[in-house]
Design a protein with these regions (language model features):
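Gly/Ala-rich beta-loop-alpha elbow adjacent to hydrolase catalytic centers
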Residues: 167-176
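Hydrolase active-site cap/lid region
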Residues: 183-233
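Catalytic histidine-centered segment of alpha/beta-hydrolase-like enzymes
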Residues: 285-295
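An N-terminal hydrophobic leader/cap segment in hydrolases
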Residues: 24-81
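Conserved alpha/beta-hydrolase
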Residues: 111, 118-140
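Conserved alpha/beta-hydrolase "acid-adjacent" motif
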Residues: 260-266
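Short beta-strand/loop motif that positions the catalytic acidic residue
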Residues: 246-247, 252-255, 259
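Alpha/beta-hydrolase active-site loop
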Residues: 143-164
Length: 307
């Protein structure tokens, strides 16, 4: 039986999750010191300070680790994938001859953070592949950004001779779309899932500017760095504008109404811009815990397996 999804739907989940979203621990004095430095030196040496700011912006503050292992982690076929000058840690479950579902994790996370999707998908005949992005988990490198993550994703898709579906969380969503639009626009994904999709790159950068109280000269130089790395205008790095430029069969967006890391605005705009998109809205599961909600998991598996 074919499932029918509304264009925008609320998920009435009864799952009770008392855990708090993990948030970085930045001391107030550390932030004040950084703000003073960027405000003062950013006016005198805008280009140099913009480079320092970009280094901070593109460097994960920690590498996610597991405090203990479990059956899913232990059952993975783990290997090192050579990407550019780095070794990328890849986790594979199931038969790679079956339809591939790629898991693209978020910023400062790791591939196995999305392992709750492995068992149900493998049991239904899919092969699930996850990876630690450059500078994350057990992969090499110290810095990352959307184009680097997108090139990693593209290389993995080519390695598997294409994939059927993908589940992205936050930063992983941006990498998936960038891969399809700018790295190799011949690639296609039939079933694409976005969990807590981030907003426009420009808006993310503006939030960073606000946090460090960046002066105008530093902002201008920072944008120049980003545009040079991407070889395009900052305004063109925008998932909401990508619909006509990517080959995606169906898109399922899942976002919490009270996500205070990446607000729901982007998901609401995308679902109206993309004809083949549906939006499932949750309440009370935040930015990180939404991925582990069992009701969300069921809907994602149903979406991927529905023909």
């Amino acid at each position: 039986m074919k499932l029918v999804f509304e264009k925008i739907e609320s998920l009435n989940s009864t799952h009770i999750d008392k855990n708090q979203d993990r948030l970085p621990k930045v001391q107030k004095w550390q932030m004040q010191l950084a703000q003073t430095g960027f405000q003062t030196l950013g006016r005198i040496f805008p280009e140099w300070m913009a480079k320092q700011a970009y280094d901070i912006f593109s460097t994960p503050r920690w590498r996610a680790k597991h405090s203990r292992t479990d059956e899913i982690i232990e059952s993975a076929n783990v290997y090192d994938f050579v990407f550019e000058e780095h070794f990328v840690k890849v986790y594979e479950w199931g038969n790679p001859q079956d339809k591939i579902i790629l898991l693209a994790h978020g910023w400062e996370s790791r591939g196995t953070a999305l392992r709750m999707y492995v068992a149900p998908l493998v049991s239904l005949g899919y092969c699930v592949v996850a990876y630690d992005a450059v500078g994350h988990g057990d992969s090499g490198g110290k810095q990352n950004n959307v184009p680097t993550n997108a090139r990693t994703i593209t290389a993995l898709i080519h390695h598997y001779n294409g994939i059927y579906g993908a589940i992205g969380h936050s930063f992983g969503c941006s990498g998936l779309v960038y891969a399809l639009q700018y790295v190799d626009n011949t690639l296609s994904i039939e079933k694409l899932v976005f969990l807590a999709v981030p907003y426009k790159t420009k808006k993310i950068i503006e939030s960073f500017f606000t946090a460090i109280k960046a002066p105008d000269g530093l902002k201008k130089s920072f944008y120049s760095i980003v545009e040079k790395l991407n070889n395009r205008s900052i305004d063109d790095i925008d998932i909401t504008k990508s619909y006509l430029h990517v080959k995606v069969g169906q898109l399922l967006l899942i976002h919490d109404r009270f996500d205070d890391v990446t607000g729901i605005d982007a998901a609401e705009e995308i679902v109206h811009q993309w004809d083949n998109a549906k939006l499932l809205v949750t309440e009370g599961y935040g930015h990180f815990r939404i991925a582990k909600n069992p009701d969300v998991l069921k809907r994602i598996v149903a979406f991927i397996t529905d023909n």
